[in-house]
Amino acid sequence: MIKLNQRQQSILKIILEKGRLQSSEVHEELTKRGEDISLVSIKRALSSMAKDGALTSIGLGRNTSYEISTIGRVFTDIAEKGYTGIEPDSRFGLDNYNFNLFPEFPTEIFNENEISDLSIATKEYHQKSRNLSSVLGDKELQRFVIELSWKSSKIEGNTYTLLDTERLIKDEIEAPGHAKDEARMILNHKDAFLFVRENEQEYQAFNLRNLEELHGILIKGLGVNKGIRKGLVGITGSKYKPLDNVFQIREAIESLGEAISRAKTPYDKALLALVGISYIQPLEDGNKRTGRLMANALLLSHGYAPLSYRSVNEDDFKGSILVFYETNSVISFKQIFKEQYIFAAEHYAVK
């Protein structure tokens, strides 16, 4: 992946916010924001960033202007709290689906240091899991399933507590005072994870068939239509409007699948599947939970630790996904993914 210093990040944010700019306009914006830098240095930085693929240059000589590329969007460091704290209609993000996003998506999302941290966690996970007895293995699996089903459902607004979820999965006892759909959602998570664990080889690659298969398990009994949605869908708290054409949605899924197949590591594949499914919103309901389970399916199929999201803050999760919807920046969510992967590798031993 490309390396960007603090000044280059500042330039990316300005062009992401303002659109196509010439070097003098970038210099003016940086000066307004308190940066002391010469126009010559700005021109040098812009030229270097265009060469590295973070920017696209248009025109020649004095007429040269710059706009942000897909790679630049993906790696612009957008602060989740600062961005989502702005009213939706005042934010500078995209309103509509970016057709260039997946065809041009980088093959490497994580830098060398991040890959090193993730690899160390994976090695620890393998060591813990290797010599686990069948009895302990079953207990570990059940603990993971309970915590994943609880937290993934909670992110969706489910009000079951962790103890409620444990009783439901272990003893088949529903919590009093809760809607039946809440219990169904949790049990569907359990069934979906166990299904992908038993059919890992089917999930080494992402495609429409296994997307619809996984979604069908997650929405069983919830009154949600299976398959690609045929109507409009809106995103609460966001001005981003997903595709509303069935044929374009299918093409977007195919494009996402190709991007996932190009991704360098299982970490890259899993993260891209999660944000990609959430971004396309191909399903009538349950897109984000399908994305979370698809990410786990890809990790499991490559022998990596699945994520429970137990320690994630739900608002941070939702906010970071929203940043990706509107700006296509993966930086905020990548940090969540990395933290949750390391947490999972350290706390579970799912064989």
Predicted regions span which residues?
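FIC/Doc superfamily catalytic core
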Residues: 1-351
